[in-house]
Amino acid sequence: MQIKDIVKKVKQIEIRTRKKTEATLMGQYHSAFKGQGMTFSEVRPYQFGDEIRRIDWNKTARFREPFVKVMEEERELTMMLLVDISASMDYGTKTQLKREYVAEIAASLGFSAAGNNDKVGLILFADKVYKVIPPQKGRKHILSIISTILTADYVPAVSKIDKAMEYMMGIFKRKSLVFLFSDFEDEYDSKMLRVASKKHQLLGMRIFDEKDNEIPDVGYTLLYDAETGQQVWANTSSARWRYTFAEAQKQKLRALEEDFANSSASFMNINTGSDYSKLLYNYFQKK
């Protein structure tokens, strides 16, 4: 992608996602995610009905009249976007690639966070962590994240989700909102999901193209795994073969859903042709 094409694409995503964000998601996001507790705001004279435990005894003694501490919700949060950049994510049979779809969802989440003055960071991973953008605030930062997702070099390697999670937990000690984007084509250590969800608020997003789950009838054809480089001939005209493939994909999805449920983490299965804003809205409502 040339620079002018990147700029154009980022701008298009910003226009589309900000409209969706402002119309539906931002309010739900604010309501759904609570901050890290209460923080001190100011001291003022005591008023009837104020809680006794809020009295500032030092200032009360000094001025010989009661003063109370005013507390406010500490709203600032950190959102981390973990994006799989293995080669299978650079694929799509619809109007956009999986990576482009991820960039749109990331933009919606990012602008929702920015609207609430929260920080957003990015980790790109495949077989290892390839890039980290530390959490920051603001529109320009979100646009930089979108551009990074769109222009990343997608890696012909098996994705190691558990390594990315372990890395994230090693550098972010404070509870964060963690959104994990992948097609989950490769194996991972489910124990890491449980460890991560105990500390962070975790949502896994399986991004898939409708052709990921089915193989068309095109006779004998050479199937190629973009991540491992393996090739195998298959008779796609065989109804039994196509059925076995489809059932294996369904079983993989069921196991994935169970892993997240058993880890007390949230999970979404999102087709690149679907309206992700409705799914996010429903997710925020349930939090």
Regions found by a protein language model. Name each.
Residues 1-33, 42, 167-174, 192-287:
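Von Willebrand factor type A / integrin I
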Residues 1-130, 135, 177:
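An amphipathic, basic-hydrophobic helix/alpha-beta surface used to engage anionic
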Residues 58, 154-158, 180-182:
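Short, flexible loop segments at the rims of nucleotide/cofactor-binding pockets, characterized by
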Residues 80, 123, 179, 203-205, ...:
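Hydrophobic/aromatic beta-strand patches that form the interior of the parallel beta-sheet core
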Residues 126-130, 186, 274-276:
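Short, internal active-site loops enriched in acidic
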Residues 132-147, 239, 258-261, 285-286:
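Short, electropositive alpha-helical surface patch
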Residues 141-176, 188-189, 209:
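Von Willebrand factor
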Residues 181-188, 202:
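Active-site glycine- and acidic-residue-rich loops that bind
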